[in-house]
């Protein structure tokens, strides 16, 4: 039995969960999220109102999907109650970010500014010209946008210039030495 999959997902008050076959819909104070659970996995509610994820047998694929499905449902519940936020930093002379409506405009040393559009359900907040955050209820969307932005200018191992997650440590390299 999967250690993660066998744990029930507790549903806090103010959150409404609808299970329709393989479709799980979670509605909370921040919005609504839905998930299509993979075919052999069964999702039910127990007497306490918690969500229970079960698998029909111990095939390798079913074991893999068991813990994954439970975690994805738990992420839906957390998303509609608390939401997800990723904070990012920009390092480098002249590198900065500016909010343009619901979009972000980056100056990253290229010959042109880079514009990132916020997808539906994701918001950007610029604290300083070198610090910004990405917020939303869908963990996958927030993480994917953060990864896409980080990829615009990855941190350089020699000078440390670039975009990185807040608190991320970049492994620095020593440059060439002269004779």
Swiss-Prot record:
Q: Which UniProt keywords apply?
A: Ribonucleoprotein, Ribosomal protein, RNA-binding, rRNA-binding
One GO cellular component, as annotated: cytosolic large ribosomal subunit
What are the GO BP annotations of this UniProt entry? Answer: cytoplasmic translation
Q: Pfam families given for it?
A: Ribosomal_L6
> Which SUPFAM superfamilies does the UniProt entry name for this protein?
Ribosomal protein L6
Gene Ontology molecular functions: rRNA binding; structural constituent of ribosome
HAMAP family assigned: Ribosomal_uL6_B
Similarity comment text for this entry? Belongs to the universal ribosomal protein uL6 family.
Relate the protein's function as given in its record: This protein binds to the 23S rRNA, and is important in its secondary structure. It is located near the subunit interface in the base of the L7/L12 stalk, and near the tRNA binding site of the peptidyltransferase center.
Query: Quaternary form?
Result: Part of the 50S ribosomal subunit.
- What protein name is recorded for this chain? Large ribosomal subunit protein uL6
Q: Name the gene for this chain.
A: rplF
């Amino acid at each position: 039995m999967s250690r993660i999959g066998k744990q029930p997902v507790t549903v806090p008050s103010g959150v409404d969960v609808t299970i329709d076959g393989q479709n799980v819909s979670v509605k909370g104070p921040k919005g609504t999220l839905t998930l299509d659970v993979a075919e052999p996995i069964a999702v039910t509610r127990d007497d306490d109102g918690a969500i229970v994820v079960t698998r029909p047998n111990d095939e390798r694929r079913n074991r893999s999907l068991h813990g994954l499905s439970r975690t994805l449902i738990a992420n839906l519940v957390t998303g509609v109650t608390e939401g997800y936020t990723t904070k990012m930093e920009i390092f480098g002379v002249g590198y900065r970010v500016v909010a343009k409506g619901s979009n972000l405009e980056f100056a990253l040393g290229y010959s042109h500014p880079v514009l990132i559009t916020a997808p539906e359900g994701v918001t950007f907040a610029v604290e300083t010209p070198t610090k910004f955050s990405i917020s939303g209820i869908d963990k996958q969307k927030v993480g994917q946008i953060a990864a896409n932005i980080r990829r615009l200018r990855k941190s350089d191992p020699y000078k440390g210039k670039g975009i990185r997650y807040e608190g991320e440590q970049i492994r620095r390299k020593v440059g060439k030495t002269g004779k």
